[in-house]
Amino acid sequence: MPPKGHAILSASSSDRWLHCPPSARLCETYEDKGSNYAAEGTDAHSLCEYKLRKALGMESTDPTENLDWYNAEMEDCATGYASFIMELLEETIQACSDPVVLIEQRVDFSRWVEQGFGTSDAILISDGTMHVIDYKHGLGILVSAENNSQMKCYALGALELFDDIYDIDTVSMTIYQPRRQNVSTYEVSKDDLYQWADEVLKPTADLAFAGDGNFLCGEWCGFCKAKHECRARVEANLLLAQHDFKLPPLLTDSEIEVILSRIDELVSWAGDIKEYALQQAISGKEWTGWKLVEGRSNRRYTSEDAVSNAVEAAGFDPYEKKLLGITAMQKLLGKSRFEELLAAYIEKPQGKPTLVPESDKRPAMNTAKNDFMEEYDNE
């Protein structure tokens, strides 16, 4: 859950300020507006906390009636989160009879990061191993625990509290992201984590807190408050855009590979600029050569009940009958009954080809050329 209070160098934004130290102070000049996604995430965390406390036999008040974003999906996600931690607890009990479980534990990692603090969703400590678990309700971005700087900051804060009490030698960090069917775990030795903190985290955090260091653009710009106006981002993307003055057939393979590695960032930047300019225009700013107009809209009913009544009174059926989609059908039947009745009628067609970095975990597709070469080799 997001920490209470304001931290210039928050763990959640550490991926950005570790790559681009000056962005920390730059973002400080912008208002924190929040978002519906953040509000939904906060509600989900509250429900997760309740579910876990209840599963552990602790007293806790059901927050459901006060959650603006509560729905059946959030209920399932929170239940799954609590079950996951209870299963992890059962596993640790096999090796340690008295593991420690902490929920919504405030952690302080200010030994390495000025004013560094946060709140860890769950911490589980057993013989030799400390588990740090973070719930992510987001759907848009798949979050990995591997070398995740936010998780490492939380782990450092947890070690500050418990390293002198328990004999910890291994830290296990887990991201639980149910809406992406993602459970990502990364283990590191305590010594390696401390080495990273001393050699990478602290020196960079000192630069960031002082507003020093060099600007650097990358995928971490996505959540930067200054991304719409950042001059370093403009210069980096305009430099890449200069390739557009060559027709693709004239580009070398290496040039195309450079563009491919940055194209998503370029598209994202262009979209950010358009959205920023639009919001400024709505607020009254006038851009030379541009004007604000009413966009296209589609007709809609002012009252669906009135439409339904009028059509039925005229002797017609206003509703279409449509087969439920797979997700809705599974909710209707239940998972086991769904598999029993419909497994034979479900298929997953091959996905549309998409070009991704080599680091992507999905296996490479066979192209027509590869298929031909395989047949040729087998002859």
Predicted regions and their residues:
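Short, charged, low-complexity amphipathic alpha-helix
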Residues: Q195-E265, P363, T367-E379
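Short coil/turn segments at secondary-structure boundaries
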Residues: C27-T29, S60-E65, P99-E104, F215-G222, ...
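Metal-dependent nuclease catalytic cores that hydrolyze phosphodiester bonds in DNA/RNA
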Residues: M1-M130, T170-S172, I263
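Mg2+/Mn2+-dependent nuclease catalytic core
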Residues: A39, D98-D206
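Extended, charge-rich alpha-helical segments
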Residues: S268-E379
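Alpha-helix N-cap/helix-initiation motif
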Residues: K33, Y37, L142-S144, T252
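DEDD superfamily 3′-5′ metal-dependent exonuclease/proofreading module
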Residues: P2, S46, L52, L56-P63, ...
